[in-house]
């Protein structure tokens, strides 16, 4: 039985893709439905994890809602000192953005919790593919791997109204 070369190439490609898919590892703290690093992606992307910690003080409960253009992670609550995290694959051209609204009694703010150009490049990028944030009343502060402190603090996003 003589197999044409074009079918042999196709067969090898199918075996390669099947092998890659079966070896893929995809674990999220919560599922992100449109995650480009999921097991059905042949082109791997670097995975990131964002951790959010309630550091409001005064026993304040933090209500928050995080999402991207494609993924809505839902409304959530963090008690004082609690943390929550989610993982995702970065977009191929480095345009990944996740933003969150945060509220507690008498206050409401929003912040871009993950911005590719801020968190994946430059001097203050997140190390080890993990961005850890403490949410404080005056703004979010990210862990700095150089100083080993939460001293990379940013202002809240400007309100649109």
UniProtKB/Swiss-Prot annotation:
Predominant location: secreted
GO terms under cellular component: extracellular region
Superkingdom as given in the UniProt entry: Eukaryota
Signal peptide: 1-24
Key word Membrane present: no
Source species: Arabidopsis thaliana (Mouse-ear cress)
Database matches in InterPro entries: Self-incomp_S1
Glycan-linked positions: 75, 106, 157
Keywords on record: Glycoprotein, Secreted, Self-incompatibility, Signal
Subcellular location: Secreted
UniProt-recorded name of the protein: S-protein homolog 2
GO BP term, pick one: rejection of self pollen
Family: Belongs to the plant self-incompatibility (S1) protein family.
């Amino acid at each position: 039985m003589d197999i044409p070369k074009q079918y042999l190439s196709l067969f090898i490609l199918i075996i390669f893709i099947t092998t890659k898919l079966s070896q893929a590892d995809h674990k999220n703290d919560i599922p992100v439905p449109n995650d480009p690093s999921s097991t059905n992606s042949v082109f791997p992307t670097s995975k990131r994890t964002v951790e959010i910690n309630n550091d409001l003080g005064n026993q304040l409960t933090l209500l928050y809602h995080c999402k991207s253009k494609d993924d809505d992670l839902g409304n959530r609550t963090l008690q004082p000192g609690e943390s929550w995290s989610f993982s995702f694959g970065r977009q191929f051209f480095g345009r990944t953005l996740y933003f969150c609204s945060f509220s507690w009694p008498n206050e409401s703010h929003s912040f871009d919790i993950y911005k590719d150009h801020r968190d994946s490049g430059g001097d203050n990028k997140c190390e080890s593919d993990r961005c850890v944030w403490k949410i404080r009343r005056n703004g979010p502060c990210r862990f700095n791997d150089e100083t080993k402190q939460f001293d990379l603090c940013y202002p809240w996003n400007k309100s649109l109204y």
